[in-house]
Amino acid sequence: MEAVLSVAIVAIIFAIGFQAMSGASQSVRAAQSSAQLIRAFTTASAEAQLGRGGFPWGVHLEFDEGTRVLSNATVFAGASYALRDVSYDSVTTFPSSVTVVSSAFVGPGIPTGNEHEVVFAPFSSDAALYGSVVVRTQERQGTFTVSPYGDITHE
């Protein structure tokens, strides 16, 4: 009887430890995904402000319109993702647990109907299309906002 009780106690302790480790692992993945997305936006803004290559710089978010799963973020050089110079591409991939809840970029720029990208002007890093994207990782949600002046914030 004591052996059964000991095994049960060990199993309970193991289950509690596993739950704690699983929760910590999810928190780390959520923080990593947020940091990667912030890095993509700030890199594009900084490259534009420095005038690297004389190009506008942007970030294209590749996500499925149906499932909303964010597969990657590409920092690119060019007036748009479609017109970019692919030799400058820097791609960050995301785990399948990262989804785009909403993506709303507006402004005086020429809308392409593509709310998957933001482009920063050379030297000023002003954003012709600006707004926010809300991303969820498991149970955590973050809002990434780009101002008309190219400022990036994360909540």
What are these regions (language model features)?
Residues 7, 12-155:
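N-terminal helix-rich module
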